[in-house]
Amino acid sequence: MCKDTYFSGEAIQLSDMLRAREERALRQLHLLKEYPEGSLLSVTMNIPGPIKTSPKLLEAFDIVIKAIQTALADDKICYQLRLLPTTGYEYYLITSLPSQDLKLKMIALETDLPIGRLMDLDVLVLSNGRPSPISRTTLGAPPRQCFICSKEAKVCGRLRKHSVEEMQTAISKLLHSFFNKDNQSSSSDKTG
């Protein structure tokens, strides 16, 4: 397993990332105002370091998007947008499903899908005129765990407990295991 397989994209600068976050917040605000009766799902990947994109990361992203669409197959989807900037992949979806129900489905997906923990599946609502994510903990779900040490992810992030190198290695191992397991089950499906 080579880390370069997963982190082979174009490196970005901090200024690029800050601009992308600003644009994402404006896009989220626009969508919440344009679809006031719908629920907004905003999907990005948790990829540390200056390289946010690669063919394998895109493959993982698209697998999760497909899983989201499958999970919401019985619900009306009013709008979808998939963006592939070098600052990280983005996906937006508006559904008629109530926001809290949508968040519960996304928590289940993050938990059930082995690579779900690499994603931010944010369900956003307007709060004081700004997009605000619904917290997992307000719905009774535990905080997300760090994929390196299993402690609370936000605490590890805030304290910068793990190096970018450590996190990229852990992500590479997770993706390698996921893709190899997926290939093995595909092979056994064909022979079975």
From Swiss-Prot:
EC number: 2.7.7.61
Top-level lineage group: Bacteria
Molecular function (Gene Ontology), one example: holo-citrate lyase synthase activity
Keyword Transferase found: yes
One of the protein's GO biological processes: prosthetic group biosynthetic process
Reaction equation(s) it catalyzes: apo-[citrate lyase ACP] + 2'-(5''-triphospho-alpha-D-ribosyl)-3'-dephospho-CoA = holo-[citrate lyase ACP] + diphosphate
Disulfide cross-links: none
Annotated keywords: Nucleotidyltransferase, Transferase
Function: Transfers 2-(5''-triphosphoribosyl)-3'-dephosphocoenzyme-A on a serine residue to the apo-acyl carrier protein (gamma chain) of the citrate lyase to yield holo-acyl carrier protein.
NCBIfam families with a match to the protein in the record: citrate_citX (TIGR03124), PRK01392.1 (NF002383)
Similarity-based family: Belongs to the CitX family.
Protein name: Probable apo-citrate lyase phosphoribosyl-dephospho-CoA transferase
Gene behind the chain: citX
